[in-house]
Amino acid sequence: MAASRTASTANTNNGASTAPLRISFAKIKEPLEVPNLLALQTESFDWLLGNDAWKARVEAALDSGQDVPTKSGLEEIFEEISPIEDFSGSMSLTFRDHRFEPPKNSIDECKDRDFTYAAPLFVTAEFTNNETGEIKSQTVFMGDFPLMTNKGTFVINGTERVVVSQLVRSPGVYFDSSIDKTSDKDIFSAKVIPSRGAWLEMEIDKRDMVGVRIDRKRKQSVTVLLKALGWTTEQILEEFGEYESMRATLEKDHTQGQDDALLDIYRKLRPGEPPTREAAQTLLENLYFNPKRYDLAKVGRYKVNKKLGGEAPLDAGILTVEDIISSIKYLVKLHAGETETVGDNGTSIVVETDDIDHFGNRRLRNVGELIQNQVRTGLARMERVVRERMTTQDVEAITPQTLINIRPVVASIKEFFGTSQLSQFMDQNNPLSGLTHKRRLSALGPGGLSRERAGFEVRDVHPSHYGRMCPIETPEGPNIGLIGSLASYGRVNAFGFVETPYRRVTDGVVTDEVDYLTADEEDRFVIAQANAPLGDDFRFEETRVLVRRRGGEVDYVPGDDVDYMDVSPRQMVSVATAMIPFLEHDDANRALMGANMMRQAVPLIKSEAPLVGTGMEYRCAVDAGDVLKSEKDGVVQEVSADYVTTANDDGTYTTYRLHKFSRSNQGTSVNQKVVVDEGARVIAGQVLADGPATENGEMALGKNLLVAFMPWEGHNYEDAIILSQRLVQDDVLSSIHIEEHEVDARDTKLGPEEITRDIPNVSEEVLADLDERGIIRIGAEVVAGDILVGKVTPKGETELTPEERLLRAIFGEKAREVRDTSLKVPHGEIGKVIGVRVFDREEGDELPPGVNQLVRVYVAQKRKITDGDKLAGRHGNKGVISKILPIEDMPFLEDGTPVDIILNPLGVPSRMNPGQVLEIHLGWLASRGWDVSGLADDWAQRLQAIEADQVAPGTNVATPVFDGAREDELAGLLQHTIPNRDGERMVLPTGKAPLFDGRSGEPFPEPISVGYMYILKLHHLVDDKLHARSTGPYSMITQQPLGGKAQFGGQRFGEMEVWALEAYGAAYALQELLTIKSDDVTGRVKVYEAIVKGENIPEPGIPESFKVLIKEMQSLCLNVEVLSSDGMSIEMRDTDEDVFRAAEELGIDLSRREPSSVEEV
């Protein structure tokens, strides 16, 4: 951030003066804005479609002399597949000029009605009959192509999804060395890895022989491959004669000439097949020299040229003989210990092994490329169909339409969005979690790593991550290090490598010119950090500057030797990490937890921006797309709860629709509130309405609460938290959660289901809140078990008595048996109905086959904060509420102000995150204001220089990461806070305050650290975890209760618990736990009967698991019998009739409910 702003200075974050006031402590002027945070997604998708936005970017890049691809993604694959020729080559089909029609439905309609937001794709297909020269051209529909919303998401079947970028090893040539276990010699190897096709691996073993592996098969001498490619022994000696290893390999190679070598290779690749020269030649051609089977891709060709000094054009996707020769030459030079060589293009090349975890060797597959690969697969499947149809159909009658079957293309796109590991259900907990999800980089997924095989090296932080991938934000657990987040300034270049910006330094003068460097370009330069002090002439003030060199080495060098300088101190961290104030004082492990927990914060009813921010809040909220922004300059004309209308300066009107209390993917409430007034002047990009967890266009994930660090009667032992009752009463930490309940009426074998108010055996009072259709009214308060939608399903036909048949003949179908299958509120849920949507096939709504009606009911609940909920700060300081104290019992300041929350001071030192303590001091300062305008101290002079010397009470402040408020500034400001009306300051200059015990009124013996901390309420709410069961579903085979809240399961009484009861001799308790409370089917029904009728509980029977054990032993051909005490064999037969008779009488449903998801099964 630039020099800090007061109300008059423009917001440096956005260029527009629309951001709310935030006084910044930043001392460093940044020459570059944070780029658009969603560009990673949107620009990649624009390239795939080749739309106008992409074309404009390409033109701008070409004008500035950059080398960028001028073909869009879809254009590339249609060109790649064209022409499709039949087997004889007499006819061909080509594709060109794809275009999109406008989408059929708007985004909101798609979400409402479970559609996919997609646009119809059309392609011009030309069929050419090469024998007659006849050309038939047609525009062919290629299916609906899912479109990206302007927020970087896709709407697939009504739900928002995100396609995560994948980090993969870049195609290219890699050299590696490992130590042989037996001889301690270095073994050098080379791998040529294509984008698709067979690998080519070479290695020099401990006997100094150069071997080659073709397509992962057995190893053979590299000279065999050279001979097969047409080289003679003389040529090989001439080229490689100076290297001992190649001479030795040639001597051991007994193949004579090209034919012999080809046959030798064929035998290794296809053992058991009769080798012929032609087959061998074709096989080798197909493996490496056929563009349909082998592709290095542009990026692979670029890496190969760069490594070996080649000159082949970037679109040469196949290997050349020169590439193979150069690779062998490089490998033998590496083995011979040479350090430099000259490439074919005359440049000098360093000979060294590669580090495969370096970001110069790992690239990103973005959304565009991932979808492109998927469409390529679909087109390849279609190509087979087209070929077959060409041969079977009559040539005269063929048109492009009759040849093309779009099913495989549509299916492969659907498959990708529906089932790929990289197409994920969007995390919509709050705007930050959505933004981070879109900027995520994953090394998992098809063609990537698997978390079981990934070692320590891949997961570790690498120096080349600097400014590209955040070293802090990554999940804890099995995915640590495999999933990362793009750094705040990073961008992806045309080859998929992540670039980061640096200021150019020429002759010791730091300029504002910015160059974007990839990781391998950066290795050549000496780079100073962003906080190196600069004089007024933009030269380095210190004689020696701290710099980074290759491989993360740190060094002090004179200013004239510096090539580049970081553009910003927050360049190396991701957006979420850049929102942690005083990050520089926190241990990385805790910062990691802090960044991850901010994504779990639940939007509260009333959002409040942090007193202590980092200046990233505004950009984060605006770029995440959950706030409503003005598209043009103008004046607000009309404002209501549901929409805003602006009269634009160009004479047009724009109406913006707001989201009111809609449900997010995670069940949190998405609600937008207007922040502008009628008649207000707005400029393009200004925030018109706040979304969830934003205030005035800034991220507002939590609340500023008054914190005291002190132990309190042991109630905050081990990170537990004590809260004030005020937070419950005033809904300070209350949030709204919305659940969606859905029921459909289908056609069954016995007739259609019916949604109705007429439900058998249900009293009128249960139906009180249902309307005449049988659907609950909006505004009804519901609790678990209440009927939301009445539905009846036909029962199986029974033999009718003549009387019943007569009745049915007279009164029609009405007498048919139906059972109640109504939608009821699930266990443990409670709330208010806020919305009902009905879809009916008869009214023209599209529904899945077999479904006649679909009803969705939305139930909202207000969750107040309660003990058991999880709270956290931004520094990884998390805890669970153990006690909520009355306001009068809370410790209070001298003026009577009670604190809101008490945290345990022991949670700070061992966790090494004192950033939270600095935060409470600065939070206190911001709430009270300060004035240091006349002081001559160093720290005061620094604040005067950035116009942060006079601050009114309650002003939000920013302390950017690595460039925030210093300790001496905080200490100084604590002495100069603005006093209250009585001229007193509640907090001493030490940052501590005398506190009084709310119960006795006595002061505590020592002053206590008090201040404002930003506290988040996390999504781990106790209401979602509490669970109880009496009877419920049982597992099919063992007949034991299921487990887990989702299955309405029971509490498992396991092996060790049984031992405990055995140890105490509690025989009867144990017997009933193992039988009638678990899997004694007959017994448990009889016990239920006995309880209902008030009789004594009967003797338990035989548990089902015992019967399963006997069956399993019988399946192993063991003859197992159960004998009674007098030696008689006992029949282990189920008396189902008894069970079902008793169950029927008691109205118990013994059938296990259908599982609602694959995981449950």
UniProtKB/Swiss-Prot annotation:
Protein role: DNA-dependent RNA polymerase catalyzes the transcription of DNA into RNA using the four ribonucleoside triphosphates as substrates.
What this protein is called in its record is: DNA-directed RNA polymerase subunit beta
Q: Which reaction does it catalyse?
A: RNA(n) + a ribonucleoside 5'-triphosphate = RNA(n+1) + diphosphate
Q: Which residues cross the membrane?
A: none
Signal peptide limits:
none
An annotated GO cellular component of this protein is: DNA-directed RNA polymerase complex
Judged by the first EC level, this protein's enzyme class is transferase
Question: Which organism is the protein's source?
Answer: Streptomyces avermitilis (strain ATCC 31267 / DSM 46492 / JCM 5070 / NBRC 14893 / NCIMB 12804 / NRRL 8165 / MA-4680)
| Name of encoding gene | rpoB
Domain of life of the source: Bacteria
